[in-house]
Amino acid sequence: GMGLANLLYAPVLLLLRNVGLLTRSRSERDVLLDEPPQGLYDAVRLRERPVSGQDGEPRSPPGPFD
């Protein structure tokens, strides 16, 4: 049971140990930085509003669905 799980799990850990050292290629990094944001990032825009309410009490800033 557990011995078999360890024998199958250990090679996966050995393959994944260097994943953090991998870097993106230069061309992929340039493409990601050059493209404008798409989708939800375009739809959600912050609007400037006074943070205090009409009665002077502080309130939370508006959310994306206000």
UniProtKB/Swiss-Prot annotation:
Recorded topology in the membrane: Multi-pass membrane protein
Keywords for this protein: Cytoplasmic vesicle, Membrane, Neurotransmitter transport, Synapse, Transmembrane, Transmembrane helix, Transport
Role this protein plays: Electrogenic antiporter that exchanges one cholinergic neurotransmitter, acetylcholine or choline, with two intravesicular protons across the membrane of synaptic vesicles. Uses the electrochemical proton gradient established by the V-type proton-pump ATPase to store neurotransmitters inside the vesicles prior to their release via exocytosis. Determines cholinergic vesicular quantal size at presynaptic nerve terminals in developing neuro-muscular junctions with an impact on motor neuron differentiation and innervation pattern.
Membrane topology, Cytoplasmic segments: 16-66
Description of how the protein assembles with itself and partners: Interacts with SEC14L1.
Biological process terms in GO annotation: neurotransmitter transport
Presence of keyword Transmembrane helix: yes
Subcellular location: Cytoplasmic vesicle, Secretory vesicle, Synaptic vesicle membrane
Transmembrane feature ranges: 1-15
Protein name: Vesicular acetylcholine transporter
Keyword Transmembrane helix set for record: yes
Signal peptide residue numbers: none
Organism, scientific name: Macaca fuscata fuscata (Japanese macaque)
Catalytic activity, as annotated: acetylcholine(out) + 2 H(+)(in) = acetylcholine(in) + 2 H(+)(out); choline(in) + 2 H(+)(out) = choline(out) + 2 H(+)(in); serotonin(in) + 2 H(+)(out) = serotonin(out) + 2 H(+)(in)
GO cellular component: synaptic vesicle membrane
Family: Belongs to the major facilitator superfamily. Vesicular transporter family.
